[in-house]
């Protein structure tokens, strides 16, 4: 179960920090805050998705990006992305190994989170944390699109919202 006493920065409509609040207060009062999503590509070119643990307080057991999480109080987006890769997948990344793909303003689909989406390559062994992740799967981008269209209810709302932007950005590279 997530620690409801975690503290996050509260931000305004322009993503500037204006205060801080506990996780429970942020979610109970729908306050604007920050999050990251990281999409990890394997050496063979597949993208890793994770199925969220049943212990998650929001959207348990749904498929989402390789790893994701809130930006903690005083933490930057990039630092948060690197931390989440370590905590959820056991991947130790350095700044030069992770790249920002796009930014998403807060909306209901992201749970009032300003989101930065990153990509990285899994150069080491992926070891999912059982407290965070039930299972992982490796798919090509086109396979993700087919699966998402076929059974959207199996995917977290933030993933459903972010995927079209991700697909567009990655198709341009």
Roles of regions detected by a PLM:
Residues 48-49, 66-99:
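The catalytic Nudix box helix
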């Amino acid at each position: 179960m997530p620690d409801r006493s975690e503290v996050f920065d509260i931000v305004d409509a322009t993503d500037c920090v204006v205060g801080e609040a506990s996780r429970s207060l942020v979610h109970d009062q729908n306050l604007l805050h920050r999050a990251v999503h990281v999409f990890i590509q394997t050496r063979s070119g597949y993208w890793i998705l994770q199925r969220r643990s049943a212990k998650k307080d929001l959207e348990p057991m749904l498929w989402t990006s390789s790893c994701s999480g809130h930006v903690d109080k005083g933490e930057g987006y990039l630092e948060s992305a690197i931390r989440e890769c370590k905590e959820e997948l056991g991947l130790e990344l350095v700044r030069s190994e992770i790249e920002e793909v796009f930014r998403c303003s807060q909306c209901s689909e992201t749970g009032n989170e300003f989101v930065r989406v990153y990509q990285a390559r899994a150069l080491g062994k992926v070891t999912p944390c059982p407290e965070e992740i039930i299972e992982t799967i490796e798919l090509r981008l086109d396979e993700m699109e087919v699966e998402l269209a076929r059974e959207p209810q199996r995917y977290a709302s933030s993933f459903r919202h972010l995927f079209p932007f991700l697909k567009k950005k990655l198709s341009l590279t």
